[in-house]
A protein has these predicted regions:
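N-terminal localization/anchoring segments of enzymes in phospholipid and broader phosphate metabolism
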Residues: 1-228
């Protein structure tokens, strides 16, 4: 039954806001560069982002990938280098070549003592993954959660999904953009013709924001607060 007052969504927003307020001290309080140091056409955007808790960073390199095909090989190479932790947060995770290859690397890293966490949107449980898939990954030593799992007839947050695509490795490199972990995003399959989605890799200080964003959403999904240094 879809409740008109949408209590589930209201509770989720309250929980998210509580976590933001309790973790804001992990984020830089201001941008690393002044407004005047930026090109004029970017100053308003930088001010807006800073007011939303996403400051501008220096000491960061950005690498652009015009296709998921290009990003995927770099993602796998960087995953192989992980020494401390791997965080994955994606809207879509679908079994196939792309996810299978990543999962094999994750299993290797878990066996090497690397902490691995996977967070994916609950809509995947409708047709892409078994509802019990988090338990399967947990047995492999991978911490896994679904964001807002869909329960037919009782869910109150059908329209509130986690569309992020974030991969963070050791807090040193992060990937984000438009590609999910599914074969069409690397043109391994062709469901709708040639698939073009872009991605970027960040190396340096700006990865801190991606790390914090992941941990905040993880806490929203688990009702727990992360208290260690991000």
């Amino acid at each position: 039954v879809y409740i008109k007052t949408d209590l589930g969504h209201r509770l989720m927003i309250r929980r998210y806001n509580d976590i933001l307020s309790q973790t804001e001290h992990f984020a830089p309080s201001e941008s690393a560069c002044s407004k005047e140091e930026l090109p004029e056409e970017l100053q308003s955007l930088a001010s807006y982002l800073n007011s939303c808790g996403f400051p501008c960073y220096q000491n960061t390199q950005a690498q652009y990938f015009p296709l998921g095909d290009d990003a995927f090989e770099v993602m796998c190479d960087e995953l192989q280098k992980a020494e401390h932790f791997i965080f994955l947060e994606y809207f879509i995770v679908r079994e196939g070549y792309m996810w299978g290859r990543i999962l094999e690397i994750l299993k290797e890293k878990v066996n090497a003592g690397v902490e691995v966490r996977v967070l994916y949107d609950g809509t995947c449980a409708v047709a892409l993954l078994p509802y019990s898939y988090p338990e399967k990954l947990e047995k492999l030593g991978i911490a896994c959660k679904m964001f807002a799992p869909l329960r037919p007839f009782v869910s109150t947050h059908y329209n509130y999904r986690d569309h992020r695509k974030i991969m963070v490795i050791d807090g040193k490199i992060g990937f984000t953009g438009g590609i999910n972990l599914s074969d069409e995003y690397i043109n391994r399959t062709s469901r709708l013709g040639h698939w073009k989605d872009t991605a970027i890799a960040l190396r340096g200080d700006a990865v801190r924001s991606l790390t914090l964003m992941f941990l905040q959403m993880w806490d929203v999904s688990s009702c727990l607060l992360y208290t260690s240094d991000a």
